[in-house]
């Protein structure tokens, strides 16, 4: 019983540690053709929304995504799981991709960090 408690505490510790870190990697985005499909959270994809897919963060978490090539930022809400391509850390909605200026490139280097509220800077 004590062993199970230690394992649970260790898993919780790792989960909170990962969520507090800034991540660097590549972002891609959902094209408009995905509009209307359901995400892992059950929401429908809206191309103009400010949402994203992330492997670890809980649904509803707000993230600041910064395009490292041009410095543009967007605050997005996690509502899906992914990306499933190696080397990518976040999939953005079309609207979020437009906000950070990545529509032409398709895949760009980004930093991702958790924010407490939309007014966080």
What kind of region is each of these model predictions?
Residues 2-5, 18-121:
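Secreted/periplasmic proteins
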Residues 6-16:
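Hydrophobic helical h-region of N-terminal Sec-dependent signal peptides
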């Amino acid at each position: 019983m004590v062993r199970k408690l230690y394992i649970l505490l260790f898993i919780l510790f790792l989960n909170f540690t990962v969520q507090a870190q800034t991540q660097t990697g590549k972002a891609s985005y959902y094209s408009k053709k995905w509009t209307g499909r359901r995400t892992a959270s059950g929401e429908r994809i809206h191309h103009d929304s400010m949402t994203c897919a992330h492997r670890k963060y809980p649904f509803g978490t707000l993230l600041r995504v910064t395009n490292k090539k041009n410095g543009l930022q967007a605050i997005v809400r996690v509502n899906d799981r992914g990306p499933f391509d190696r080397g990518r850390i976040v999939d953005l909605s079309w609207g979020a991709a437009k906000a950070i200026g990545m529509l032409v490139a398709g895949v760009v280097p980004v930093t991702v960090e958790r924010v407490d509220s939309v007014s966080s800077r």
